[in-house]
Amino acid sequence: MKKKHRIKKNDEFQTVFQKGKSNANRQFVVYQLDKEEQPNFRIGLSVSKKIGNAVVRNRIKRMIRQSITELKDEIDSGKDFVIIARKPCAEMTYEELKKSLIHVFKRSGMKRIKSSVRK
């Protein structure tokens, strides 16, 4: 993901947590905050130590980033997202993870996201 699409600072994460809306499924919690003045969407990732060791956590983050890269044209601009991975992500394949991410994005009200998973 490019720098313009990332949330890195703790205070930016906290703003999304406190002022944003959340949606969840079994694998992810997604917090969403509208920022009309911003030309791009931004995404922050959080994968807890409860999920597994560093290898597992980094694998999950890589798969989420790749999914976001493939979906970037369909994600609404002018929004900040924080994606929190839950324990079931550790055993998921890339296709399952992407499908679950699309599901939770649709629950959050994004209409442009398509259900098809490209292999």
Swiss-Prot record:
Keywords annotated in UniProt: Endonuclease, Hydrolase, Nuclease, RNA-binding, tRNA processing
Superkingdom of origin organism: Bacteria
An individual GO BP term: tRNA 5'-leader removal
A GO term, aspect molecular function: ribonuclease P activity
The UniProt record lists the keyword RNA-binding: yes
InterPro entries: Ribosomal_Su5_D2-typ_SF, Ribsml_uS5_D2-typ_fold_subgr, RNase_P, RNase_P_CS
GO CC field: ribonuclease P complex
SUPFAM superfamilies: Ribosomal protein S5 domain 2-like
Family matches, as PROSITE patterns: RIBONUCLEASE_P
Gene3D superfamilies per the UniProt record, alphabetical: 3.30.230.10
NCBIfam families: rnpA (TIGR00188)
Name of the protein this chain belongs to: Ribonuclease P protein component
